Amino acid sequence: MEEFKRYLELHRFQQHDFIYPLIFQEYIYALAHGRGLNGSIFFENAGYDNKSSLLIVKRLITHLITQMYQQNHFLFYTNDFNPNKFLGCNTNLYSQMIFEGFAVVVEIPFYLRLLSFLEGKERVKSHNLRSLHSIFPFLEDKFSHLNSLLDILIPHPVHLEILVQTLRYWVKDPSSLHLLRFFLHEYPNWNSLMTPKKSSFSFSKRNQRFFFFLYNFYVCEYESIFVFLRNQSSHLCSTSSETLSERICFYKKIELEEVFTKDFKAILWVFKDPFLHYVRYRGKSILASKDSSLLMNKWKYYLVNIWECYFYIWSQPRRIHINQLSNNSLDFLGYLLSVRLKPSMVRSQMIENSFLIENAIKQFDIIVPITPLVTSLSKAKFCNVLGHPYSKPSWAESSDSDIIERFGRIYRNLSHYHSGSLKKISLYRIKYILRLSCARTLARKHKSTVRSFLKRLGVGLLEEFFTEEEQVFYLTFPRASSTSGKLYQRRIWYLDIFCINDPANHE
């Protein structure tokens, strides 16, 4: 890392986060394109054309800045300027390169803060905590002792100007932020860079790295405020939350006789809960507590006001649900989570008398919902919305072994991810859909019926649809009968899963 710092000449800009000169360094764009130091934590291969001229990128930045200061109204292009061509190149392509390079540069101060934070501390070398499954053992251990939770969908999108204003408190470099604001507002197709959807928010394939950085920064800022409220909850009776509106004075407390905020227009309630747990994945988060739903209502009130007063986002009430774990299930990361009361009878013997004691134990229950899986398969054209299998004509040109392997890989990935549920009935139906879809694809290729093709193929088709844990079971119990389903009852969490595989991505 020391060599990397010298290579970027960070010792000249590190003290004041002066990153503006780095934007004009050509090797920054080489790093952003994956041409050097691919093993770094925050550099990834972006897959650009090797024929791209970094010199043109540098000239393009200079031209944009010149245009910005020459035009009275900060017009991006003159009347006779072609927005699609500049210096014989595609402007959109090089604007994309500028965004990617800028994302790399802006990430540097945050990475340096991370290094300074980790100095003198024992770093966890294992990547297991990055796995999606690493969260479920924690939920198993904690959720059975909790009563209520908030099911939160983080609101979006945030206006880009708000993100720039928030970013300036962390990156104290006005020149870089002015250039960033100029790119965002004067980019010819900046509205198409982000694609809002009904229930989610996604980024276009162009400039993903840059806007992922802005979105992650927004979530980080929201969570820092949340953590501040959580840690300072016992002091809210004498502290104004006016500091939430000014990030510069974030950690400075303003003592007031009465707790009345200027922006929130409400009196803060005092609360303190040592059994408060927070979990987030992408835009969905969970706030669970052992206390009553009254505390959850207070937290809901605070979160809504934070989003409206600090980020100027109107949060719809339906985006935050108060859920009682004992009565409802929680949809999280492809599972339905709930806490069920499992009755148990204990016989007690006292001298000559015996009696039964009825007891109820809270048990963390995990179910794989079938509807989202079937919907995902139907979008990928493996079946219809009711689960009736289709053939895949686009795969019919491949070899038989390749077709079987592709179908088998999709099922193994789905079964691998949903191995944490003890109830496998949903996975059995998914296996049925994929096996029949595979058989119909092969029959279509060989211009035969499914029945005759399966008779000729035998059980060879089934072998590709066995997962690793099923193979271990059948090797251990080779003579297991139909009762094997009852014997094979165990919950497995894999620590090598970093994303949810969508069947549509296997197209």
From Swiss-Prot:
As for family, the record states:
Belongs to the intron maturase 2 family. MatK subfamily.
Q: Does the keyword Plastid apply?
A: yes
Task: Summarize the protein's role.
Answer: Usually encoded in the trnK tRNA gene intron. Probably assists in splicing its own and other chloroplast group II introns.
> What is the name listed in the Swiss-Prot or TrEMBL entry for this protein?
Maturase K
Spell out the subcellular localization from the entry.
Plastid, Chloroplast
Q: What keywords appear on the UniProt entry? A: Chloroplast, mRNA processing, Plastid, RNA-binding, tRNA processing
MF terms in GO:
RNA binding
Biological process terms in GO annotation = mRNA processing; RNA splicing; tRNA processing
**One GO CC term on file:** chloroplast
Q: Which PANTHER family match?
A: MATURASE K
Q: Which InterPro entries match?
A: Domain_X (IPR024937), Maturase_MatK (IPR002866), Maturase_MatK_N (IPR024942)
Q: Which Pfam families match?
A: Intron_maturas2 (PF01348), MatK_N (PF01824)
Q: Which residues form a coiled coil?
A: none
